[in-house]
Amino acid sequence: MLAIGRKKVERKGWTDRVQLIEGDSADLPFEDGTFDGYTVAFGVRNFEKLEAGLTEMHRTLKPGGMGVVLEFSKPTVFPLKQIFHFYFHTLMPGVGKLVSKDAAAYSYLPESVEAFPEGDEFMQIMQKCGYRQCQMHRLTSGIASIYTGIK
């Protein structure tokens, strides 16, 4: 992933402005209050230690800084809920087995989405980790959600 990112940064001519770093979400290599904000897209559900990762990202925010998390969620509206469930749990893993050498990746995604705390439950975890003014915005009838919180 980082190798692909480095190639993109080089191609865009951003090597003087962008630094890619590999690290542990629960032990970030940055000083307290370093950032005005952060964004994480479809990655927080993969944290081994969700609360530790959120707390650590909170630590790196400046006072008043905003954390933004985009994650998959489970739609609740008929018939999208049923269509999404069939696609995510049956069709995608089945096609993944046929076309990929890593069939486990296609079953991991729906499993990780099912296990991830969403909605009010995730916002309560954010609050426990120090965020305030937590909000959630559902996208595409609930297939994904954006969570925000302020330090």
Placement of each model-derived feature along the sequence:
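A short hydrophobic/small-residue beta-strand
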Residues: 67-68, 133
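Hydrophobic beta-strand segment of the Class I
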Residues: 38-39
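Short conserved loop adjoining the S-adenosyl-L-methionine
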Residues: 27-32, 48
